[in-house]
Amino acid sequence: MTVETVIVLAAGEGTRMKSAKAKVLHSVAGRSLLGHVLHAVDHLKAKNVRIVVGSGRELVEEHISLIAPKASTVFQEHRGGTGHAAQLALAGLSPKGTVLVLAGDTPMLTGESLAAFIDAHNAGKFAASVLTAEHPDPTGYGRIIRDDADELLKIVEEKDATDDQRFIF
């Protein structure tokens, strides 16, 4: 398992949570959402860990300095989506090696599951891999659109999804 860079997306406003606190700072089982993700990331021993911050920047950066002092932060002033955030985080880094992009609000990730994912990605010599999950109630989440061979075609945000796509779990 080798991964050069991990990018953690932590700029979201957490609108669905209806809280003034940055989404990634909310606690689950005694640790912030972001803390759970960074705990899993520690297992990978990545050369670079970059965390994209936005909403609640000051408090999020303060929290990061306490729980992941070796990580660096990148400010996403205008929310331009996942691709834009990854592009900001990659600026100035070598284009070599595996890059893992994670959402900062996924507390169920483990170091073992990330390592297995990276191993599968590297073994398959894929240009890109997407780790997905099925959710019993996908309301508010994007949908993974696949072809007949179960290959990923695209990711569609719920607001942009057709009625048929909204039935995808």
Question: Where do the protein language model's features map onto the residues?
Answer:
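Conserved N-terminal catalytic core of the sugar/cofactor nucleotidyltransferase
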Residues: M1-T5, R31-D119, A123, R146
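Glycine-rich N-terminal loop/short-helix segment of MobA-like nucleotidyltransferase
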Residues: V3-V28, L44, I67
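Short beta-strand/turn micro-motifs composed of small residues
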Residues: A10, V53, A103, T132-A133
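Short glycine-enriched loop/turn motifs at secondary-structure junctions
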Residues: K18-A20, L102, Q165-F169
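Conserved beta-strand segments of alpha/beta enzyme cores
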Residues: V24, K70-S72, E151
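Conserved beta-strand scaffold positions in the cores of enzyme catalytic domains, especially
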Residues: L25, T73, A128-V130
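Hydrophobic residues at beta-strand termini and immediately following loops
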Residues: V28, V74, I155
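Conserved core of the sugar-phosphate nucleotidyltransferase
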Residues: E58, L109-F169
